Amino acid sequence: MASTDQLIQEKPKLLAGVVKASLKALRFIRNERDATIATAMKFAGLDKRLATRMYDDLIGTFTQNGTVDEETQRNDIEVIRQILKMPETIPTQKAYDFRFAREADRQLTQSGWRP
């Protein structure tokens, strides 16, 4: 998920809500395999075999809590740098801000939210 510094500064409550909703969706996807496959079949028009394969192939790439480790951050920045033909890399702390994800994860965990 990406945002601008302007949106973070001007509408932090909106951004917090979007991040929290996204984490709820991720928790649902991770915990409700059959329902997620059925949803993919319905909304993407996939047959069960393909939807199941897609789920099984991708589930390991989904973040647990809305954050990614520093190595993943550096790799992502490097790919973007190459695509945009940027001469310099961007420091991870300038490109990533996980405070909204960490807070949403804390709130959901503390409240005992389950899909």
Q: Where do the language-model regions lie?
A:
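Short glycine- and hydrophobic/aromatic-rich loop-to-beta-strand nucleating segment
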Residues: M1-A2, L7-I8
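Generic, ordered loop/turn and secondary-structure boundary motif
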Residues: I8-Q9, T63, Y96-A101
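Secondary-structure end/capping motifs
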Residues: E10-E88
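Conserved C-terminal helix/tail region of periplasmic/extracytoplasmic solute-binding proteins
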Residues: R81-P115
